[in-house]
């Protein structure tokens, strides 16, 4: 992988920057705080986004202060493809938070991903590492130079395993472990399902469903035969009944047709008689019309002679007479108009006179009424005074009858008496109500007592039934407990046998929980021994090669290069040392193989122990279920016993309560009789007191009414006297009015006399005009009558011709009706012949017999059908049971296969888990070996002092530095510069190991190596070695190495140098190429 271009806006101290990366070594220098590390952080963030931020930083810290938007575009080349990541961020000044607004990944110019999380995942996939692995391998940040050294072994193991993709194997092993647990759970569930299915199969088979089904099918077959026979009989009866129905219907239709024909003949005869009558009527009408025609002709001749019309045409005659009548009518209208004016004037005068007369008459009538009213008022006053006297005498008599002497004190005495009687009546009413209330309460209490007795009887029955039911359930539960205890003992015996087998394998019961740990430990030991075995075999092969070469040299006698004798030389000593080392390694290898064989035996025993432990676990589960079931049954027994005791106590209390209620009921009956007597006496006394009170109140009311009536009559007398006075004043006014009306009446009469004379003259003129108009109107009427007679004569002639045609039509109709009567009489005769020999009653009797037989057969069919339905229902239930049995057997077979399958899956998962453990251990051993070789090689290359011999990296990733004298040291005890060298060497060794993983000693797939201030703790000599280390990394294929440093030697040796500066006024950084 190579970085190509970085474009940033508003990131840290950079306002805007477009930076191009070159191949080779690039050194970025500048003063402290100028923005060198910010440039590297921008590259890091361009790759992994906001995931690079630690918990002490937020995204807003990466954005230039005061800016609202920011952008990072990072272009890079990886495995032959060009990639570009565009990221944009938005800052909110209100919330003071920043968020990602855009994240797009392009490959060869094509948009492939447009989302932050997916882009992050794609970059992880491309580089085979996340941001943490990137920091631990390629990007050595400032201040994190000794992170790997100071990390705990577990953390260091995790970091390096993640880089080498070994963490995946551990993840797969954990998944396999989870799968084993799930399979074990499924296996247990399958076993429980097997038990349930077997129990259900046994329950169905115990009912012998096949035998019962055959018997029911035979019965159903017999029932079908009976039904078939009954249906045939029913069909025969229905067919016979249908035939009779048809014959009866045909008989009835013929009778009905005969009646219809007779009725038609009767109607035809009536129509014929009607035709004769109509013909006679038409003939008479023709004769009458001819007579009328003759009379009209004679009348017309007489009219012409009388009126002098002569032989004029009727139209000319009518026109002449209409003109004369119109002239006479106009004269009459003119005279009538003048007469109407005079009449109107006369009417007005007469009306005025009438009104005066009416007014005068009204005044006289009013005068008379006033005089009459005065007399009547005087008579009323006398009557009122007579009524007052009678009422006073009646009141006096009532008071004397009641024993009151004076009228003045009688009202007070009556009031006192009424009050006394009211108090007495109230007391008696209270006594009556009290007695009624007590009686009602007693009756209600008696009713409640009876209801309680009924409820107690029901409760007694329910309690007894509950006691019996509880006893039955206790017996069933105790039986179940005994069976449960027996099953527990059987399972415990089986468990004891399994424990004995487990003990024979050398495992105690308390060690079962640690079997998984033992298994993992043994597998790790096996893997470790396997790794040592392979390492010793490789070393032995190398020693054997060396020994063989030395022997060949010894056989030659001289060194082939310098020609020196080999006896006694250093090569001879080395050969002896190799022989000794070979014997040692062979012995160690044999010991390891023995240990390996023992481990295999232990693993085999452990597998057997695991199987036994699984059986023990299953037994424990079954025992636990049975114990829980027994506990539940025990609780139910205790519950039932407690309920039985409660019900027994309840029975006793109910019996006691029943006796109390019966005693209370008898006492209540006695009390009710006494209260009924008391209530009757109180009611009688109250009625008598109430009667006396009513009489006294009636007397008081009557006296009060008489007094009020007297007062009313005195008021009326006063009113009448006032009316008499008013009537006197009215009489004077009316007399004055009558005098004025008499004067007006005389003037009106004189005016009317003059109008009467003028009216007589106008009426005379009108009579003469009317007479002339009447004569002309009479002549016009005679002319119109002559015209009407002529028209009538034409109509009569036309009518006579129509009547003669109708007479001819009626004669033809009579002939047609005679033919119809003959045809229908013949049809009646034919139908009568067909009906002979068939009697309706006989047919109906036969039909009733067949209908009764059909109903009886239908009832038999219904009973047989119900019987068949019941059989079919039972057959269906049995077939369902057999179907369920087949399904259960299939399910049983499937469950058995599933159990075998799950056992195989569990075994495979266990084997797979062991394989993952073994592979991980093997790969870790190989990686540790390779990493150790690379680490020591680079440490020897980098470290200029000779104080340390080598570095050891054990299987647990513990790092140990050895001095020349063999003394081990912890890396954290080294000096700062030594730790820096050690960290650089370790990072470069990991980088080289990863390069080997990408295919040979090439780093094409790895990101550029970035070193941020690597020379902080290094002296001049080690800085020169750092330059050599950088050259070595270039030689193994690292295409880009980016270093941030102030050191001149690094700057001088770099391929590309850039200077970073910051403007102190704007606080913005910029970069220039040197």
UniProtKB/Swiss-Prot annotation:
Gene3D superfamilies recorded = Helix hairpin bin, P-loop containing nucleotide triphosphate hydrolases
Q: Does the keyword Transcription apply?
A: no
Arranged from A to Z, the UniProt key words for this protein are: ATP-binding, Coiled coil, DNA damage, DNA repair, Hydrolase, Metal-binding, Nucleotide-binding, Zinc
Q: Which GO terms describe its molecular function?
A: ATP binding; ATP hydrolysis activity; DNA exonuclease activity; zinc ion binding
Q: How is the cofactor bound?
A: Binds 1 zinc ion per homodimer.
- Where is ATP annotated to bind? 12, 32-38, 142, 973-978
Binding positions for Zn(2+)? 559, 562
> Per the database entry, which stretches of residues form a coiled coil?
355-402, 452-506, 574-611, 649-678, 749-823, 865-895
Kindly list the biological process annotations in GO that this record carries: DNA repair; double-strand break repair
Q: Tell me the cofactors it needs.
A: Zn(2+)
Q: Name one GO cellular component term.
A: DNA repair complex
UniProt key word Secreted: no
Q: InterPro entries, from UniProt?
A: P-loop_NTPase, Rad50_ATPase_archaeal, RecF/RecN/SMC_N, Zn_hook_RAD50
Domain spans labelled Zinc-hook: 512-611
Q: Which Pfam families match?
A: SMC_N (PF02463)
Give the source's domain of life in one word: Archaea
**What does the protein in this record do?**
Part of the Rad50/Mre11 complex, which is involved in the early steps of DNA double-strand break (DSB) repair. The complex may facilitate opening of the processed DNA ends to aid in the recruitment of HerA and NurA. Rad50 controls the balance between DNA end bridging and DNA resection via ATP-dependent structural rearrangements of the Rad50/Mre11 complex.
Q: Which family does it belong to?
A: Belongs to the SMC family. RAD50 subfamily.
Domain observations: The two conserved Cys that bind zinc constitute the zinc-hook, which separates the large intramolecular coiled coil regions. The 2 Cys residues coordinate one molecule of zinc with the help of the 2 Cys residues of the zinc-hook of another Rad50 molecule, thereby forming a V-shaped homodimer.
Describe the protein's quaternary organization and the partners it interacts with. Homodimer. Forms a heterotetramer composed of two Mre11 subunits and two Rad50 subunits.
Q: Which PANTHER family match?
A: ABC TRANSPORTER ABCH.3
| Protein name (database record) | DNA double-strand break repair Rad50 ATPase
Source organism of the structure: Methanosarcina acetivorans (strain ATCC 35395 / DSM 2834 / JCM 12185 / C2A)
| Gene that encodes it | rad50
């Amino acid at each position: 992988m190579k970085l190509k271009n970085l474009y940033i806006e508003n990131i840290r101290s950079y306002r805007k920057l477009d930076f191009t990366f070159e191949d080779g070594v690039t050194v970025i220098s500048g003063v402290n705080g100028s923005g060198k590390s910010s440039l590297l952080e921008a590259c890091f963030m361009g790759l992994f986004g906001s995931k690079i931020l630690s918990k002490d930083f937020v995204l807003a810290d990466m954005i230039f202060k005061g800016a609202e938007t920011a952008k990072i575009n990072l272009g890079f080349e990886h495995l032959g493809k060009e990639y570009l990541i565009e990221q944009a961020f938005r800052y909110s000044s209100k919330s003071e938070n920043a968020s990602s607004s855009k994240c797009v990944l392009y490959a060869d110019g094509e948009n492939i991903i447009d989302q932050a999380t997916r882009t992050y995942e794609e970059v992880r996939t491309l580089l085979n590492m996340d941001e943490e692995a990137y920091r631990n391998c390629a990007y050595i940040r400032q201040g994190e130079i000794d992170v790997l050294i100071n990390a705990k072994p577990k953390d260091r193991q995790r970091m390096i395993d993640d880089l080498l993709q070994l963490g995946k194997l551990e993840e797969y092993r954990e998944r396999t472990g989870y799968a084993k647990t799930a399979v074990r759970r499924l296996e247990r569930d399958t076993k429980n399902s097997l038990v349930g299915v077997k129990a259900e199969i046994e329950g169905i088979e115990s009912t012998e469903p096949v035998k019962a089904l055959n018997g029911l099918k035979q019965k159903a077959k017999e029932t079908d035969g009976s039904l078939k026979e009954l249906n045939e009989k029913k069909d025969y009866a229905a067919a016979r009944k249908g035939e009779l129905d048809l014959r009866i219907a045909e008989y009835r239709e013929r009778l009905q047709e005969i009646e219809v024909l007779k009725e038609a003949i009767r109607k035809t005869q009536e129509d014929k008689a009607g035709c004769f009558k109509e013909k006679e009527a038409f003939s008479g009408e023709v004769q009458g019309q001819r007579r009328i025609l003759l009379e009209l002709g004679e009348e017309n001749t007489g009219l012409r002679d009388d009126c002098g019309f002569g032989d004029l045409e009727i139209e000319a005659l009518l026109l002449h007479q209409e003109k004369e009548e119109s002239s006479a009518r106009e004269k009459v209208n003119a005279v009538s108009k003048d007469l109407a004016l005079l009449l109107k004037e006369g009417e007005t005068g007469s009306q005025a006179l009438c009104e005066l007369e009416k007014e005068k008459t009204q005044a006289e009538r009013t005068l008379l009424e006033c005089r009459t009213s005065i007399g009547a008022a005087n008579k009323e006053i006398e009557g009122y005074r007579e009524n007052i006297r009678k009422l006073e005498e009646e009141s006096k008599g009532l008071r004397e009858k009641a024993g009151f002497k004076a009228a003045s004190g009688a009202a007070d005495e009556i009031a006192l008496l009424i009050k006394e009687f009211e108090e007495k009546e109230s007391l008696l009413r209270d006594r009556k109500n009290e007695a009624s209330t007590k009686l009602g309460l007693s009756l209600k209490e008696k009713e409640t007592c009876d209801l309680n007795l009924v409820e107690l009887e029901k409760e007694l029955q329910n309690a007894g039934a509950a006691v019996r039911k509880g006893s039955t359930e206790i017996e069933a539960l105790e039986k179940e407990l005994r069976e449960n205890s027996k099953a527990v003992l059987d399972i415990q015996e089986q468990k004891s046998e399994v424990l004995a087998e487990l003990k024979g394998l050398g495992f105690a019961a308390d060690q079962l929980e640690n079997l998984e740990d033992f298994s993992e430990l043994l597998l790790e030991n096996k893997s470790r021994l396997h790794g040592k075995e392979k390492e010793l075999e490789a070393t032995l092969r190398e020693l054997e090669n060396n020994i063989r070469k030395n022997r060949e040299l010894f056989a030659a006698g001289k060194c082939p290069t310098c020609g020196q004798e080999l006896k006694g030389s250093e090569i001879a000593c080395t050969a002896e040392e190799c022989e000794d080392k070979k014997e040692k390694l062979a012995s160690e290898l044999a010991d390891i193989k023995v240990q390996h064989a023992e481990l295999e035996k232990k693993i085999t025993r452990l597998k057997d122990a695991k199987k036994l432990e699984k059986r023990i676990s299953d037994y424990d589960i079954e025992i636990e279920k049975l114990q829980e079931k027994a506990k539940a049954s025990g609780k139910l027994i205790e519950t039932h016993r407690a309920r039985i005791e409660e019900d027994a106590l309840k029975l006793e209390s109910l019996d006691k309560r029943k006796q109390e209620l019966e005693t209370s009921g008898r006492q209540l009956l006695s009390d009710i009789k006494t209260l009924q007597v008391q209530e009757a006496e109180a009611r009688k006394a109250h009625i008598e007191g109430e009667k006396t009170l009513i009489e006294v109140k009636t007397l008081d009311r009557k006296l009060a009414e008489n007094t009020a009536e007297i007062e009313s009559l005195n008021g009326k007398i006063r009113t009448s006297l006032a009316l008499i006075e008013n009537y006197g004043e009215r009489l004077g006014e009316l007399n004055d009015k009558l005098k004025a009306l008499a004067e007006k009446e005389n003037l009106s009469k004189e005016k009317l006399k003059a109008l009467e004379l003028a009216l007589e003259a106008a009426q005379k003129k009108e009579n003469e005009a009317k007479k002339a108009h009447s004569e002309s109107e009479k002549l016009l009427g005679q002319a119109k009558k002559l015209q009407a007679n002529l028209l009538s004569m034409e109509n009569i002639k036309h009518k006579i011709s129509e009547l003669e045609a109708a007479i001819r039509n009626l004669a033809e109709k009579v002939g047609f009706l005679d033919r119809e009567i003959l045809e229908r009489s013949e049809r009646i005769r034919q139908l009568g012949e067909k009906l002979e020999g068939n009697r309706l009653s006989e047919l109906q009797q036969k039909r009733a017999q067949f209908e009764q037989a059909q109903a009886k057969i239908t009832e038999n069919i219904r009973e047989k059908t119900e019987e068949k339905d019941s059989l079919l229902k039972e057959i269906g239930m049995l077939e369902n049971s057999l179907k369920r049995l087949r399904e259960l057997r299939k399910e049983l077979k499937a469950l058995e296969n599933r159990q075998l399958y799950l056992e195989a899956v569990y075994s495979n998962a266990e084997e797979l888990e062991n394989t993952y453990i073994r592979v991980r251990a093997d790969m870790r051993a190989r990686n540790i070996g390779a990493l150790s070789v690379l680490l020591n090689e680079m440490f020897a290359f980098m470290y200029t002092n000779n104080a340390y011999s080598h570095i050891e990296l054990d299987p647990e990733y513990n790092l140990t530095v050895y001095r020349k004298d063999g003394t081990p040291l912890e890396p954290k005890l080294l000096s700062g510069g030594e730790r820096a060298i050690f960290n650089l060497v370790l990072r470069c060794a990991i980088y080289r190991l990863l390069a080997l993983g990408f295919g040979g000693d090439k780093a094409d797939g790895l990101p550029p190596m970035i070193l941020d201030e690597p020379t902080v703790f290094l002296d001049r000599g080690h800085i020169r070695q750092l330059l050599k280390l950088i050259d070595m990394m270039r030689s193994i294929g690292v295409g880009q190495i980016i270093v941030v440093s102030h050191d001149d030697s690094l700057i001088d040796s770099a391929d590309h140098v850039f200077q970073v500066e910051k403007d102190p006024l704007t606080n913005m950084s910029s970069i220039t190429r040197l």
